[in-house]
């Protein structure tokens, strides 16, 4: 939980420094980094004071379990997130430019009067470059699993096996640790 708070706090400091009202994050890598959410559908909105996670009814329970410190908001569609942004007078919005489609950009510009956007891609990458304790522990665990899987594969591999068979073995072996 502390990790999520720390990550959000670092982004909030950046928002203040750059005079951005909020960051709107929806790509899976940055969404998971900021919220902890492992599902496939959700939007993170970080303002200078709050952090919210928007998702539809299918994922609200999962979000509640995986997104400590973020307010969970149930929505019907992406348009509900845009309505939230518009109703809270968020005019300077940070976006992950590389992940923002033309359709979404147009919807934001249409839905939020006088909206200014700024790319936050490089800042999120900078934040993610410095590993916290949770990430270090995950990397260590992944290395342990990889070492065990490689050792097991070395014992079972034989001439005539295809790459697909070896891959399937490794995938199945590693999934056993999750």
Predicted regions and their residues:
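Flexible, acidic/His-enriched mid-domain "rim/lid" segments that flank
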Residues: 3, 79-178
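Terminal domain-start leader segments
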Residues: 1-54, 79-90, 108-117, 151, ...
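Structural motif
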Residues: 26-28, 55-57, 76, 95-100
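Short helix/loop capping segments that flank catalytic or ligand/cofactor-binding pockets
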Residues: 33-34, 62-63, 103
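Compact, glycine/acidic-enriched structural inserts
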Residues: 55-84
């Amino acid at each position: 939980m502390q990790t999520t708070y720390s990550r959000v706090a670092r982004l909030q400091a950046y928002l203040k420094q750059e005079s951005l009202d909020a960051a709107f994050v929806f790509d899976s890598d940055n969404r998971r980094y900021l919220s902890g959410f492992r599902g496939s559908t959700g939007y993170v909105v970080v303002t200078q004071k709050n952090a919210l996670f928007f998702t539809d009814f299918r994922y609200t329970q999962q979000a509640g379990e995986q997104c400590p410190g973020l307010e969970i908001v149930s929505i019907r569609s992406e348009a509900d997130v845009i309505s939230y942004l518009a109703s809270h007078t968020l005019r300077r919005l940070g976006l992950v430019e590389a992940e923002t489609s033309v359709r979404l950009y147009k919807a934001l510009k249409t839905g939020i009067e006088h909206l200014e956007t700024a790319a936050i891609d490089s800042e999120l990458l900078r934040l993610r470059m410095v590993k916290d304790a949770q990430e270090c522990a995950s990397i260590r665990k992944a290395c342990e699993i990889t070492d065990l899987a490689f050792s097991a594969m070395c014992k079972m591999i034989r001439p005539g096996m295809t790459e697909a068979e070896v891959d399937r073995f490794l995938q199945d072996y590693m999934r056993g640790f999750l």
